[in-house]
Regions:
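Alpha/beta-hydrolase fold catalytic core
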Residues: 1-54, 77-78, 118, 301, ...
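Active-site loop/oxyanion-hole signature of alpha/beta-hydrolase fold enzymes
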Residues: 38-41, 46, 74, 85-123, ...
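Conserved HGGG/HGGXW glycine-rich cap/lid loop of the alpha/beta-hydrolase fold
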Residues: 44-90
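Conserved hydrolase catalytic core segment
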Residues: 118-159
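Conserved alpha/beta-hydrolase catalytic His-Asp/Glu region
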Residues: 175-228
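Conserved serine/cysteine hydrolase catalytic core
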Residues: 208-272
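Catalytic histidine neighborhood in serine/cysteine hydrolases
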Residues: 273-286
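Catalytic histidine-centered segment of alpha/beta-hydrolase-like enzymes
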Residues: 284-297
Length: 311
């Protein structure tokens, strides 16, 4: 295990994250943890407020990592676990390069058995949201409530997420952090240079030739398998997940970003498919947990406090 230390490069952004989150209390203990998920692979994550059992588990989107939740979890202030999805952050890459939600869900469910012994609020952003939906459907006893951030099973990658897909699959190396930040801004990933610099720094590594490359596996695959079909032959590859969501008995909250991926049409479809679920809109772009951590924490806090226990 590695515990947060201001001198450790991995955790050097935490004091600034706390300021952005409006946190005045001392930083909680943050520990790097991991669990075996089979095939010789391990899933890595960050445990906040160790050694308390997590009350919320967070799953990031494609091309991100557990550290993307640091500002949000500091704002929320609850014991938490943020996982690096397979092929991301410090989690091992899949030999088959297959990062579809169903494969991710199997690994996440296995990791939760080891790292989250009590039922949790399960939150997933983007690809992590689809993954969380499948985990909640398959293991209802482990999930007190489900929060999905800015994605629905009705999303069409070609129509709704083309810029993000191209950003992940496009340029693979950079002269420095500034060049990667410039590309992120150009693709509408964000506009706050300081926040983007933090994110890029925590999501890149230096190659032998001195150039930077992304740490996640998706940037190293010619056709990363996330369920999205770049040829557009399956315009709604995630649609079968609606059926899984309809079996979830825990409360479900969709948090929609005001300038994100969930269009009015997708929000309407959500209401038709899941009339008992709740929708809240938060001002900000797709990566709300990075761009609007306090507002997202406010949207989630009441559900965290009121979600029914699982016995």
């Amino acid at each position: 295990m590695t515990t947060a230390d201001a001198q450790d490069p991995e955790f050097r952004f935490l004091p600034g994250d706390a300021l952005r989150a409006g946190r005045t209390a001392p930083l909680p203990p943050v520990t790097r943890v991991s669990a075996s998920v089979g095939e010789g692979r391990r899933l890595s994550g960050l445990s906040f407020d160790t050694p308390a059992a997590p009350r919320i588990v967070a799953l990031h989107g494609a091309g991100l990592n557990a550290h993307s939740f640091d500002p949000f979890l500091l704002a929320l202030g609850a014991p938490a676990l943020a996982l690096d999805l397979p092929g991301h952050g410090r989690s091992d890459w899949r030999a088959d390069g297959d990062y579809r939600p169903d494969h991710l869900a199997d690994d996440v469910a296995t990791a939760l058995e080891a790292l989250a012994p009590e039922p949790v609020v399960l939150l997933g952003h983007s690809l992590g949201g689809l993954t969380a939906a499948l985990v909640a459907a398959a293991q209802p006893e482990r999930v007190r409530a489900l929060v999905i951030v800015d994605i629905t099973p009705g999303l069409s990658p070609a129509r709704d997420a083309g810029a993000v897909t191209e950003f992940i699959r496009g340029q693979r190396s950079f002269a420095d952090v500034a060049e990667a930040v410039d590309r992120a801004i150009a693709f509408g990933i964000g506009s706050d240079r300081a926040a983007l610099t933090r994110g890029v720094t925590l999501n890149t590594r230096t190659r032998a030739d001195g150039r930077l490359e992304w740490t996640h596996h998706l940037a190293h695959l010619d056709a990363p398998a996330t369920g999205a079909d770049p040829a557009g032959e399956d315009p709604q590859p995630y649609a079968p997940i609606w059926a899984s969501l309809q079996t979830v008995t825990a409360p479900i909250l969709l948090v929609r970003a005001s300038s994100g991926m969930v269009s009015d049409a997708l929000a309407k479809e959500w209401r038709e498919q899941l009339p008992e679920a709740t929708i809240r809109e938060v001002s900000g772009p797709h990566n709300l947990h990075e761009a609007a951590p306090v507002a997202l924490a406010e949207a989630v806090a009441s559900l965290l406090a009121t979600a029914p226990d699982r016995t």
